[in-house]
């Protein structure tokens, strides 16, 4: 996990050297104030998320365990799928055969 290099206090107490044609000191201070506000917001978010993680871990520890499908039940599911597909194929073939057989009988009966 990455470590935090600066705190809001570090940013607040940072001094910059003023050189010839240096940066506007008020502009730098305003920018650093915004950064400090962001750091405070990030710290609050982190604290809130850590609390939520702890709450969810406790909830997970206290909740009943759900069982995951075992290899045996997976095998049963795998064997059921081909049979249902086979049943569908059989019904489709039977339907075609009935149309073929009964269709010819209807034509013969009409003659």
From Swiss-Prot:
Coiled-coil stretches: 32-63
Keyword list, A-Z: Cell cycle, Cell division, Cell shape, Coiled coil, Cytoplasm
Region (Disordered): 59-80
InterPro entries assigned to the protein according to its UniProt record, in alphabetical order: Cell_cycle_GpsB, DivIVA_domain, DivIVA_fam
Gene3D superfamilies: 6.10.250.660
Domain of life where this protein originates: Bacteria
Cellular location(s): Cytoplasm
Biological processes, Gene Ontology terms: cell division; regulation of cell shape
Disulfide-linked positions: none
Regions of compositional bias (Polar residues) in chain numbering: 60-71
GO cellular component, one term: cytoplasm
Purpose: Divisome component that associates with the complex late in its assembly, after the Z-ring is formed, and is dependent on DivIC and PBP2B for its recruitment to the divisome. Together with EzrA, is a key component of the system that regulates PBP1 localization during cell cycle progression. Its main role could be the removal of PBP1 from the cell pole after pole maturation is completed. Also contributes to the recruitment of PBP1 to the division complex. Not essential for septum formation.
UniProt family annotation: Belongs to the GpsB family.
Assembly with partners or alone: Forms polymers through the coiled coil domains. Interacts with PBP1, MreC and EzrA.
Protein name as it appears in the record: Cell cycle protein GpsB
Lineage: Bacteria, Bacillati, Bacillota, Bacilli, Lactobacillales
